[in-house]
Amino acid sequence: MNLETGSRGSEFGMSAVSCGNGKLRQWLIDQIDSGKYPGLVWENEEKSVFRIPWKHAGKQDYNREEDAALFKAWALFKGKFREGIDKPDPPTWKTRLRCALNKSNDFEELVERSQLDISDPYKVYRIVPEGAKKGAKQLTLDDTQMAMGHPYPMTAPYGSLPAQQVHNYMMPPHDRSWRDYAPDQSHPEIPYQCPVTFGPRGHHWQGPSCENGCQVTGTFYACAPPESQAPGIPIEPSIRSAEALALSDCRLHICLYYRDILVKELTTTSPEGCRISHGHTYDVSNLDQVLFPYPDDNGQRKNIEKLLSHLERGLVLWMAPDGLYAKRLCQSRIYWDGPLALCSDRPNKLERDQTCKLFDTQQFLSELQVFAHHGRPAPRFQVTLCFGEEFPDPQRQRKLITAHVEPLLARQLYYFAQQNTGHFLRGYELPEHVTTPDYHRSLRHSSIQE
């Protein structure tokens, strides 16, 4: 394929007549070898792994002529864009190439080597040898939606919330108490999901105006109790004291792993929470510092060190009276799984500089009551964090860098429930003195200086 001569259309490896006859594999190899696209390079001498620039169109330094050139070339090659006739649409060009890569059995993304949260983001792909190919890939739900023209993944539909509960969410923040965020015990038909984000991911969602002038905005949290919940049972003062002591506990038990090998285990003690990071820290706050150690010399050391290099600002975790929160400050992508994860079979990403709730105390206690009184499955209280790689990922269980986090109060109450099955726990409410600023402790971490 000659890419160096002819009109601008042939410059991008395309002609209007032959656009549908080429294959992505050979086309991409030709583009990489041409050297015309900055950042599109081979990663190894064997020319089996390559890096492809992946800058978002919303970046301030985005240059359409340069950053969208490869995506435009693919659209030209496939006949999906006609120079001088069709309106330029870089996001759609990018979507088409991404879907083609995901669908093709010629390519496999090396997620642990891709970097999407740096100033010049890129993805890394491996060209699958002919003898190692599997059947054709199936497009994921996100890919299908993107191909259909949706610029962002769409969440599954949920039934409408009861009017009273919607009213609570529409109240101004300063008029809300913690009860407005607690589970509505009278509507067991509402499944628990946290968070349920309406509209484009990473964008502020704004719903239609209501007749009373209120408008629903933001990210919603809805939860319901188990199908059957035993009424409050009087308990001995000693048990009540044990519960109260546990519920005032802000400690976190944290285990750090490299490739399933435990490299550090500790318990944090600061009421302000902790910061998980790597390398030297210059933090002057009261956060406990949880540092990933330098990896031993093994086959994955370089890959691990590369991921660790993007953890400088780290991840902040803290316990509030109502649950465990996280705020990602580092460049590295962080994915998580836990009792509040929206998806159990595909990645849940912590967005940068946004607070996310990972564990809900009220939900845990409701499930613990049912476990203790009715023998239901034990409630989940462990959160898994995965750094630099998509998680959960059923196809690739072993990850380079992970952390397991448990609120110590949850483990204590779970063990206590095991030992006192049948006469444990009353209906739990957050203390009356918990004010709105206390509830939103995330605000205390929004001004952390790095």
UniProtKB/Swiss-Prot annotation:
DNA-binding region: 21-129
Keyword Chaperone among record annotations: no
Top-level taxon: Eukaryota
Subcellular localization(s) per the UniProt record: Nucleus; Cytoplasm
Gene3D superfamilies: 2.60.200.10, Winged helix-like DNA-binding domain superfamily/Winged helix DNA-binding domain
PROSITE patterns: IRF_1, IRF_2
Record-linked Pfam families: IRF, IRF-3
GO CC field: cytosol; nucleoplasm; nucleosome
Tissue: Lymphoid cells.
GO biological process, one term: positive regulation of transcription by RNA polymerase II
UniProt keyword Nucleus, yes or no: yes
Induction note: Not induced by interferons.
Modified residues (Phosphoserine): S446, S447
Intrachain disulfide bonds: none
Family that this chain belongs to: Belongs to the IRF family.
Function: Transcriptional activator. Binds to the interferon-stimulated response element (ISRE) of the MHC class I promoter. Binds the immunoglobulin lambda light chain enhancer, together with PU.1. Probably plays a role in ISRE-targeted signal transduction mechanisms specific to lymphoid cells. Involved in CD8(+) dendritic cell differentiation by forming a complex with the BATF-JUNB heterodimer in immune cells, leading to recognition of AICE sequence (5'-TGAnTCA/GAAA-3'), an immune-specific regulatory element, followed by cooperative binding of BATF and IRF4 and activation of genes.
Known partners and oligomeric status: Interacts with SPIB and DEF6. Interacts with the BATF-JUNB heterodimer. Interacts with BATF (via bZIP domain); the interaction is direct. Directly interacts with NLRP3 in the nucleus of Th2 cells; this interaction enhances IRF4 ability to bind to the IL4 promoter and is required for optimal IRF4-dependent IL4 transcription. Interacts with SPI1.
Entry protein name: Interferon regulatory factor 4
Gene name of the encoded protein: Irf4
